[in-house]
Amino acid sequence: MDLYEYQGRDLFERHGLPVLAGGVATTPEEARAIAERLGGRVVVKAQVKVGGRGKAGGVKLAEGADETVARATDILGMDIKGHTVHKVMITVTADVAEEYYFSYLLDRANRTFLCIASVAGGMDIEQVAAETPEKVVKAPIDANTGVDAAMARQIITRAGFPAEVVDQAVEVAVDLWKAFVAEDATLVEVNPLARTGQGGLLLLDAKVSLDENAAFRHPDHEALVDQAAVDPLEQAAKEKDLNYVKLDGEVGIIGNGAGLVMSTLDVVAYAGERHGGVKPANFLDIGGGASAAVMANGLEIVLSDPSVKSVFVNVFGGITACDAVANGIVQALALLEQRGEKVTRPLVVRLDGNNAEAGRAILDGANNPLIQRVDTMDGAAERAAELAAAGV
């Protein structure tokens, strides 16, 4: 789960890291109250989970409460790369002398944690690494030992931080690691980590991602979810314990197993190129226990998306045999009818694996005109794309 900047700032503050005084506002009136509390010159920053806010006009300076209200009014409601601004963060300004970069992240490729540090802060770190790689230090972190003062000093020194800030930077690095671990984060990034004219260090930006798989250890993280940005179908699927992600397409996808579903997305996208460019409408993994109730819930979620014109059910029978899945599909359609959900869009079903022949026979015997059985994955994807294109 990616946090907004103000949420990351608050998280850093809770862990004792030096951040700017500020607050978050959803209305110009709230912005006025924050500006009056802070006093003097402030920065008004759009809260969206994309970069490029400054170039889009989403970051503005303001002097006094009236100007802060005007800036907040301009920014609230803006569209920045498809994201509507619902909140602004308002902080005091800082007298910045130098800018550095510091982050910890989960390095999935190497199955470890990674620290990245640079004296070239305030810029895109990937650009810095590409153009001046000598300015970027990358240090693997052993999860068993973590980051203590000695290791932090080694990283900070290698990165070339000025001698006068090394001690402070070491303290920040250690505390930031503690926050990273305590919150089960997959990324904490500070860009820039600034040295002020008075010589102190401040974390002027906060980019934080939390591991949703560790949410059971952090009931407080639930409050960080932006309900206004949550897709209602994804929320409904979550409540039914379904792994669903909405996409921008016309072919609904239901499969058992994340790997199979990902492959299904690929073959449908490829087939769709030959049928008007139709695309997968979602990712939905119903897991191994494809009971009638689970299948009905899955179909209900997928068919609740008005952009879906056809549904591709792709199942490889393993522990759950294909005949059980086929019965689940037939019963699911009947169950949806009982719920008052009139199903009119076609289902293309491909079954393979354990008891596939028996499952196919069940589908054929159901004589349901909505069910079209295709026995190959490519053929089923082709048919689903064709039906979706015809229904668009």
Curated annotation (Swiss-Prot):
NCBIfam families: PRK00696.1, sucCoAbeta. Mg(2+) binds at N191, D205. Gene3D superfamilies: ATP-grasp fold, A domain, ATP-grasp fold, B domain, Succinyl-CoA synthetase domains. This is Succinate--CoA ligase [ADP-forming] subunit beta. Succinyl-CoA synthetase functions in the citric acid cycle (TCA), coupling the hydrolysis of succinyl-CoA to the synthesis of either ATP or GTP and thus represents the only step of substrate-level phosphorylation in the TCA. The beta subunit provides nucleotide specificity of the enzyme and binds the substrate succinate, while the binding sites for coenzyme A and phosphate are found in the alpha subunit. ATP binds at K45, G52, R53, G54, A94, E99. The keyword Nucleotide-binding applies. Pathway: Carbohydrate metabolism; tricarboxylic acid cycle; succinate from succinyl-CoA (ligase route): step 1/1. Heterotetramer of two alpha and two beta subunits. Keywords: ATP-binding, Ligase, Magnesium, Metal-binding, Nucleotide-binding, Tricarboxylic acid cycle. Its cofactor is Mg(2+). The gene is sucC. Binds 1 Mg(2+) ion per subunit. GO terms for biological process: succinyl-CoA metabolic process; tricarboxylic acid cycle. InterPro entries: ATP-grasp, ATP-grasp_succ-CoA_synth-type, ATP_grasp_subdomain_1, Succ-CoA_synthase_bsu_CS, SUCC_ACL_C, Succ_CoA_ligase-like_bsu, Succinyl-CoA_synth-like. Residues 9-236 form the ATP-grasp domain. Pfam families: ATP-grasp_2 (PF08442), Ligase_CoA (PF00549). SUPFAM superfamilies: Glutathione synthetase ATP-binding domain-like, Succinyl-CoA synthetase domains. It comes from Salinispora arenicola (strain CNS-205). It comes from the Bacteria. Belongs to the succinate/malate CoA ligase beta subunit family. HAMAP family: Succ_CoA_beta. One of its GO terms (cellular component) is cytosol. It catalyses: succinate + ATP + CoA = succinyl-CoA + ADP + phosphate; GTP + succinate + CoA = succinyl-CoA + GDP + phosphate. Coiled coil: none annotated. One of its GO terms (molecular function) is magnesium ion binding.
